[in-house]
């Protein structure tokens, strides 16, 4: 497969390096000149428990890129989706497609820019971190799913899957890509909650006193999905049915235990959200990932007060008015406690 990967960080870099190693014709684009320069000079190095190798892959900044591609993988942070989609548009062939390998419901934004017929959905849940220019940690395997946003199973998504099998042999095609994306939104709300602290994902999810909070967050997101007519899909220990009000009383606990086990197997101990806040000291994807859910929920008369409060607390950490600590997670849990007592 000949493809352009727009965003060569944790997700795009890991995918691009593996595809290059398997013989695919990959070109990378990234906004960080120091990252591009390191890749040009030394190659893109993948490290971690799963694979350690260096891929020689051409890399460019957006302003130096020339050419046109039939397949472009968009792997930027969610809040950069619109600007990235507009920047890549001159490089997309008339019959080409853009695949969103991101967190969130970014296919909606991409479709607005490039057209729905040129937009392909993808769901990736593997663990990776950008460590330094030219170096990516591939910390843990996770689900890899591709699908048309209208639910059809087409030759192009089958071709993408065949290529992505060279990255992960478990890659699949789905007729319900929105189900995976909304499922990740529910799990993602839990990850944002863990990032209010300095605990690892696994340690935070294992804490008994916060489990009712995690369940309530997932329930809010899944209620909005249901209001949109979406049936959420499960992955890597996350079982959406376990968080429904009609689920057996121990179902959510079992799912959380499986999520803890999944995350303990990964060398990536903390979420990208935590890393944005604690290490890179930059804005997170919270508005593009969770803020949009609050807005969709309000429009559907399906309120999400816990999710809205979580967005506020992440903003507090971003602007320096709160610290990442269990006290901040307690501030979110207090709202849930007030709701339960109402």
Regions found by a protein language model. Name each.
Residues 198-213:
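Active-site lid/adjacent beta-loop-alpha segment flanking the redox-cofactor pocket in flavoenzymes
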Residues 1-51:
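NAD(P)+-binding Rossmann beta1-loop-alpha1 motif at the extreme N-terminus of oxidoreductases
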Residues 67, 101-190, 195-199:
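Rossmann-fold dinucleotide-binding core
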Residues 29, 53-135:
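Rossmann-like NAD(P)(H) cofactor-binding subdomain of soluble oxidoreductases
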Residues 24, 169, 230:
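Short phosphate-binding/catalytic loops that engage adenosine nucleotides
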Residues 215, 219-342:
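NAD(P)-dependent Rossmann-like dehydrogenase/reductase catalytic/cofactor-binding core
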Residues 1, 70, 142:
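Nucleotide donor/acceptor-binding cores
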